[in-house]
Amino acid sequence: MYKFKRSFRRRLSPIGSGNLIYYRNMSLISRFISEQGKILSRRVNRLTLKQQRLITIAIKQARILSLLPFINNEKQFERIESITRVKGFIKK
């Protein structure tokens, strides 16, 4: 029996060699945060373990220094406002 070799293509990291993982680099950090403001997992980010650790530390530092919100509730407030508007129209 013959064993076929599967071709394995290594995926490029979303963080280039020129990008600095730093809490002030908001354009880089914002790519690794969900819409709710949560840190995305390593599988979703496709980062190495070391890069994920550095990103996590940078995000936490940015949150503590108020550069990033801990939780992003903007969409939740929009939904509540639209529900109250609909209820107001029904009463009248």
UniProtKB/Swiss-Prot annotation:
NCBIfam families cross-referenced by the UniProt entry: S18
Family: Belongs to the bacterial ribosomal protein bS18 family.
GO biological process, one term: translation
Gene that encodes the chain: rps18
Subunit structure: Part of the 30S ribosomal subunit.
Signal peptide: none
Keyword NADP (UniProt): no
Coiled-coil residue windows: none
Protein's name in the database: Small ribosomal subunit protein bS18c
Organism: Epifagus virginiana
GO molecular function: small ribosomal subunit rRNA binding; structural constituent of ribosome
Subcellular localization, as worded in the UniProt entry: Plastid
Keyword Acetylation: no
Main location: plastid
